[in-house]
Curated annotation (Swiss-Prot):
Keywords: Nucleotide-binding. PANTHER family: UPF0234 PROTEIN YAJQ (PTHR30476:SF0). Nucleotide-binding protein. InterPro entries: DUF520, UPF0234-like_C, UPF0234_N, YajQ-like_sf. GO terms for molecular function: nucleotide binding. This is Nucleotide-binding protein SUN_0226. It holds the Pfam family DUF520. One of its GO terms (cellular component) is cytosol. Belongs to the YajQ family.
Amino acid sequence: MAKDHYFDISAKLDMMEMKNAIEQAKKEVSTRFDFKGIMVEIDLNEKAKVLNLSSSSDSKIDALKDIVMSKMIKRGLSTKSLDEVKTEGISGGNVKVVYRIVDSIEKDEAKKIVKAIKDAKLKVTPSIQGDEIRVTGKKIDDLQAVIALVKQMEDLKAPLTFGNFK
C-alpha cells in the first residue's frame, strides 16, 4: 500500500531575522551622509506586527524604504512580508509610512491557491488548515509539480514558504 506524502504551504516570517534586518537598517541610516541631521525613525512593533518609517520628506522615506527592503533581502526575507497600510503627514512636515507585517495566508488567497491546485488536475488533495494549506498526494512528483505551480502564481500577496515535507 502506497504511503501518502504531504507538505504545508504557509506564510510564516522569522521575526528574529526581521529584527536583525531592522537593526542593520538603523545602523546603515546612522552612518549615511544623506541622513545626517535629519529626523529618521524606524520602529518595529512585534506584538502589533507593524513597521513604522518616519522621515522629513518623501524622498527620504523612499530611500529609507529601499534600505529596509535591501536588508530584508540580504537576511533571506521576502519583501512581500510588508504590506503598506498608509502614508500620512505628521507634525513639522514629516512623513510617516505604516507597514503591516504579513505572516499568514488570508482566507481568500488560500481559496485562490486551492482552486488553482484543483484546476491543475493533479492527483493531490489541498486542504486549508487555519493559516496553512496542506497538500497531500501519493507521488512526490505531483507534490513537486504543485510547488512549481504555486511559485508561478504571481498575483499572490503573501510570501509563501513550503515546509513540513513528509
